[in-house]
């Protein structure tokens, strides 16, 4: 009996983004290559579970080692290969497994892989320009994921919980989690591994203290972690682009008139509600992220669309420089070949 091993290497990119970009005294930029996952039994001993390993510097492939009898869910059309198994016939792949993220109005299809023995599989990103990253949940912190389509794969153990919230479809659950800045999001909690797909390159920003803050475009945030509901509420806030002017020159009669004060409070409350709703519906707003926490940032690289001219392309007629000579009575006359066509 012989076994063949497969090695896949991705060449290093010619252009490398400097590691000091976005780095500071308290802001740390790290790659996402710590990929071994372990859980702890009740007796304190470690047991190896499903392992995710990213391949390459800007990984578009992930090698996943699946333990026996532990289901692995992979987004449809993302499985590249299944290999390194004693018996591939013992690996069951269910292609009709639908996993509905209904609170976000997104219907996603996942393939379910489960085997009686350990096997490996390769999973690819959605696009060649995207980058894969691994979230390892150990039960101490939860993660917020903004886009349900960014989830590529996850292990189906009972300790891992994935919940999706939408403002208009399950308002009370959405408001109870305190992350009111985001219109829809997913909450990952428990223990397990989740493979995410980021647009462009993905970097991990470490905000080490409460004083560390960073302003990001909202759609560039792939995921961020937190301890509890209150922590998530304070994690992300809208960035105010203008400061409200304090009207010190208001007439004293306004302060003394309770009806006008109540009216102004109602107007301010209405304006704040409309502004919050406008920010929630918009995708180009900037938000302020406060530490301490880890933020996954995606560069959102998009290929420029090919532009074609609106007018019809036409070629200029080529000039004819071909001539012929005619000898008549000792004289030589040169004429262009177009004269032959005119005679016809």
UniProtKB/Swiss-Prot annotation:
It holds the Pfam family AIM24. GO terms for cellular component: mitochondrial inner membrane. The keyword Transit peptide applies. Residues 1-13 form a transit peptide. GO terms for biological process: inner mitochondrial membrane organization. It is found in: Mitochondrion. Keywords: Mitochondrion, Transit peptide. SUPFAM superfamilies: TRAP-like. Its main location: mitochondrion. Belongs to the AIM24 family. This is Altered inheritance of mitochondria protein 24, mitochondrial. It comes from Kluyveromyces lactis (strain ATCC 8585 / CBS 2359 / DSM 70799 / NBRC 1267 / NRRL Y-1140 / WM37). The lineage of its organism: Eukaryota, Fungi, Dikarya, Ascomycota, Saccharomycotina.
């Amino acid at each position: 009996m012989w076994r063949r091993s497969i090695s896949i290497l991705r060449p290093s990119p010619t252009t490398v983004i400097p590691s000091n970009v976005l780095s500071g005294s308290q802001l740390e930029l790290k790659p996402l290559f710590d990929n071994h996952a372990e859980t702890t039994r009740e007796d304190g001993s470690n047991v190896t579970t499903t392992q995710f390993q990213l391949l390459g510097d800007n990984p578009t492939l992930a090698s996943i080692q699946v333990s026996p009898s532990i289901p692995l869910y992979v987004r449809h059309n993302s499985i590249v290969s299944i290999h390194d198994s004693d018996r591939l016939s013992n690996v069951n792949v269910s292609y009709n497994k639908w996993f509905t993220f209904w609170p976000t109005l997104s219907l996603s299809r996942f393939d379910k892989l489960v085997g009686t023995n350990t096997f490996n599989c390769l999973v690819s990103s959605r696009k060649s320009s995207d980058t894969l990253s691994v979230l390892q949940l150990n039960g101490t912190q939860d993660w917020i994921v903004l886009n349900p389509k960014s989830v590529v794969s996850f292990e189906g153990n009972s300790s891992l919980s994935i919940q999706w919230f939408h403002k208009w479809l399950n308002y009370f659950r959405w408001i109870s989690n305190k992350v009111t800045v985001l219109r829809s999001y997913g909450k990952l909690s428990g223990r397990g591994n989740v493979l995410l797909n980021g647009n462009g390159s993905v970097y991990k920003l470490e905000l080490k203290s409460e004083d560390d803050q960073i302003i990001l475009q909202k759609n560039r945030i792939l995921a961020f972690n937190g301890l509890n509901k209150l922590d998530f509420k304070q994690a992300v806030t809208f960035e105010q682009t203008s400061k409200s002017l304090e009207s010190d020159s208001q007439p004293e009669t306004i302060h003394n008139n309770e009806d006008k004060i109540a009216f102004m409070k109602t107007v301010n409350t209405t304006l704040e509600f409309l502004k919050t709703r406008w920010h929630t519906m918009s995708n180009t707003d900037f938000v302020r992220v406060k530490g301490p926490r880890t933020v996954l940032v995606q560069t959102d690289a998009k290929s420029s669309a090919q532009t074609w001219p609106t007018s019809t392309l036409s070629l200029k007629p080529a000039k004819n420089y071909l001539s012929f000579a005619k000898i008549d009575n000792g004289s030589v006359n040169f004429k262009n070949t177009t004269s032959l066509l005119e005679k016809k």
